[in-house]
Amino acid sequence: VAGYRGNTFNAPAYITILSEEKDNYLINAGFMAENLVLKLEEMGLSSCFLTSDDSEMIKKVLLINSDLAVATVIAFGYGKKERDTTKLDIHSPSNVSISNKAGHIAPKIAATALAFDSDFNTPYNFDDEYSDPVIADAVYAASLSPSFLNHQNYRFVINGTHIYLFNQLDNVVPDDDNLLGLGAAMLNFYIILASKYSGIGNWRFDTSDIKADFKNPSDYTLVAALDI
């Protein structure tokens, strides 16, 4: 009913997030859930998004009486120390940094492979003399977000102060898990920008006014945009 790759996931505690089943509700749930995950990390706790295959059964088992759907379940507790990696440190909304963290992380796609300049034919140049260091940090922060099997199906296209987010659905990552991970990446990207720039807009899902040719592969779809 809830687990990871078809297996049960035993943890001392769980967080269940419920939602109305509206447009983009899973992306929104992933966005909110990642905020909770970062708070758990701040408290020294490890966590994991679980696949939720049967909302009604989960509510029945947990004695939840609600018309809302189970959007996601997060398992958390004190994890075993394995090796050093990196994490986001959120000291306040205006003070966010990336630091070393003790724990385990599976290999992920490099941040440099996740971002493009204006279109998919031009990789984003992360060299300090060419790139905006805040945007570079935001892409890196997004790359640290939870992603099912670390597939990281999202891509960023950066055109000056305009950020375009693309997503790929595939046969490996369940669509629900894909969208939850997309929301988590959006949160990490956003909080880095918001910590350095004042007055930035919010992610928007209505991209019908955007007519640019991003030269994106046919399996990548524009899902959101953000103006700095």
Question: Which sequence ranges carry the predicted segments?
Answer:
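Acidic, surface-exposed loops and disordered segments
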Residues: V1-I228
